[in-house]
Swiss-Prot record:
Organism per entry: Francisella tularensis subsp. tularensis (strain SCHU S4 / Schu 4)
PROSITE patterns tied to this protein: AA_TRNA_LIGASE_I (PS00178)
Swiss-Prot/TrEMBL catalytic activity: tRNA(Arg) + L-arginine + ATP = L-arginyl-tRNA(Arg) + AMP + diphosphate
Subunit structure: Monomer.
Identification of the protein by name: Arginine--tRNA ligase
HAMAP family: Arg_tRNA_synth (MF_00123)
Family named by the database record: Belongs to the class-I aminoacyl-tRNA synthetase family.
């Protein structure tokens, strides 16, 4: 139950009864919880339509509200705010209801939808680096959130395995090892099962090949020709390319596994290649495609968005072509209700073109919504894209090692590697996901690793503190679900209990915002606020030495609720919680 929605529906009945549009009855969480819990600001915009002062409208609304079981206090403040304070029993009962529900008050979306999530997107032959973490962590959080809310999710890594970089690699290897059988056009036998290069060598070859092609137009033409021949099915090139893909996927899977990020599909641009001819024929049959200066293009029919080049002058296909073919493939194979691309904002124009063409040509069905989650860049303290001290790109494995080093330095007596890894992952993931995805942000590992403030280790520390209370009372193998039947939250005895209850019942609000806006930072902010409320409760509301048994059990119930809410919230952003720290 989203408490904002519940209160809005309660007020909407009064608005309707008085002849006002229900849309003005929206209730939001107050930014001043010391003054009120929630507020309704609808009287101000409503005044223009009702031809009444907003203060008079607000007073009229409050006069007609009859819900003493929900509200302890309803006050009107200038120029027309309705300030809401919840009744203590309603607050306690709602907290209990959430504690005893599987998803802490979150209800499944109805009807359930099928959502394809395209994220990760590493390129073959390139090791993953710090710049890849945004797509990986944001996409993983979104798949967790969508599944939690009841959607059927299909996640696809969508490897970059079919572009000009493949031709660059082929030509570079041909230059250094021309004797390899892959380059003999007359060869008809079986190709070796082992790759002629390792993934480490591939990572060294690509920058060299890229540099050569950028500095020499003739070398670039060779790479383009090799790419074209690969896409046309030249046997030796296909066999060599298959080696590139296999060894790259093996390495990338290890990187994603280290982040606890997993995919349902490991497809790439190449997997859509077999659909391109069918799709082009469809475009031609329906007069969507036309020739322009030797290339074949499709108009987007959107102001300011240029046509999409589908086939180049040389007959090769473009990045946009394979993206369209991927949409074609996903529509036929999966029939999704939504496809979400988690790709950085520098690709915004590209996706506007692809989405516009896909919708105009009906590559996707009318029911299918296309969304680009366009995230900002990961920058260092200097405001530029994050680099190592030596000025190079930091590989993901090195970043994780650094995070573990920070965790170990702050806990020198901790010898459990699994706990160090959990702290390191919380450091990296929370440090990234606490930011609104649309913004660039500064990646400061030293700051993210602090055990105080808005950090992952602070959240872990808080939950471990709450768990230790329960462990001291119930032993190591306690089960919150079964215990919650006998431990009930009661009306708050002080402001710390009240604020903790109020924070707990806002969990469904945070989840809904994260779900609807593809913004996991709402869950991060919720978890941080809940951690603050619990730590104040912990300091000011003793449990172990209480003589009042009913109050003791009520506070234990609040500890249970905190552990449950924090555990679910942490899991939604891909963070696992240790038993101790």
């Amino acid at each position: 139950m989203n408490i904002e929605n519940y209160l809005s529906e309660t007020l909407a009945k009064v608005f309707q009864k008085l002849g006002y549009a229900e849309s003005f009855a929206k209730v939001v969480t107050s930014t001043r919880e010391d003054v009120r819990h929630f507020q309704c600001n609808g009287a101000m915009p409503l005044a223009k339509f009702a031809k009444k002062p907003p203060l008079a409208i607000a007073e009229e609304i409050v006069e007609h509200i009859d819900a003493e079981d929900i509200f302890a206090k309803l006050e009107v403040a200038k120029p027309g705010f309705i300030n809401i304070t919840l009744a203590p029993k309603f607050l306690a009962d709602t907290t209990n209801r959430f504690l005893n529900s599987n998803k802490f008050g979150v209800q499944n979306n109805l009807p359930n939808r099928k959502v394809v999530l395209d994220f990760g997107g590493p390129n073959v032959a390139k090791p993953m680096h710090v710049g890849h973490i945004r797509s990986a962590l944001l996409g993983d959080a979104l798949q967790r959130i969508h599944r939690f809310c009841g959607d059927t999710v299909v996640s696809d890594v969508h490897l970059g395995d079919w572009g000009t970089q493949m031709g660059m690699l082929i030509e570079e290897i041909k230059l250094q090892s021309p004797q390899l059988v892959y380059f003999d056009e007359n060869y008809t036998g079986e190709y070796p099962t082992e790759s002629p290069v390792t993934v480490q060598e591939l990572a060294e070859i690509y920058p060299r090949a890229s540099k050569r092609c950028k500095s020499d137009i003739n070398e670039m033409e060779k790479a383009r020709l090799a790419t074209f021949e690969l896409q046309q099915g030249r046997r030796g090139y296909v066999a060599l390319w298959q080696h590139f893909v296999r060894i790259s996927i093996d390495a990338v899977k290890k990187d994603f596994d280290s982040l606890d990020v997993h995919f349902d599909l490991w497809l790439g641009e190449s997997d859509a290649n077999k659909f391109i001819d069918e799709m082009i024929s469809y475009f031609q049959a329906n007069n969507f495609i036309y020739e322009d200066e030797g290339a074949w293009v499709i108009d987007t029919n959107k102001d300011g968005v240029p046509p999409l080049i589908v086939i180049k002058k040389d007959g090769g296909v473009m990045y946009g072509t394979t993206d369209l073919a991927t949409l074609w493939q996903r529509s036929k194979d999966l029939d999704p209700d939504e496809i979400i691309y988690v790709v950085d904002k520098r690709q915004s124009l590209h996706f506007k073109q692809v989405f516009s063409v896909a919708e105009r040509t009906k590559v996707v069905s009318e029911k299918c919504k296309l969304k680009h989650v366009a995230f900002g860049t990961v920058n260092g303290k200097d405001g530029r894209p994050f680099k190592t001290r030596e000025g190079g790109v930091m590989h993901l494995a090195d970043l994780i090692s650094q995070a573990k080093e920070y965790a170990k330095n702050r806990m020198p007596d901790e010898n459990d590697d699994s706990i160090i890894n959990q702290i390191a992952m919380a450091t990296i993931k929370f440090g990234d996901l606490i930011n609104n995805y649309a913004n660039d942000y500064f990646f400061d590992l030293e700051k993210f690793a602090q055990h105080e403030g808005k950090t992952g280790p602070y959240l872990l520390y808080t939950v471990v503190r709450a768990k230790s209370i329960l462990r001291k009372i119930f032993g190591d193998n306690y089960d919150i679900k079964s215990l919650a039947k006998d431990y009930k939250v009661v009306n708050a005895h002080n402001e710390y209990e009240e604020k903790l209850q109020l924070q707990l019942i806002q969990f469904p609000i945070a989840v809904q915002r994260a779900y609807e806006n593809s913004q996991p930072h709402h869950i991060c902010e919720y978890a941080y606020s809940l951690a603050n409320s619990f730590n104040k409760f912990y300091v000011n509301c003793p449990i172990n030495n209480l003589d009042d048994e009913s109050l003791k059990k009520a506070r234990i119930a609040l500890c249970m609720a905190t552990v449950k809410a924090m555990t679910i919230a942490s899991d939604l952003i891909g963070i696992s919680i240790p038993e101790r720290m």
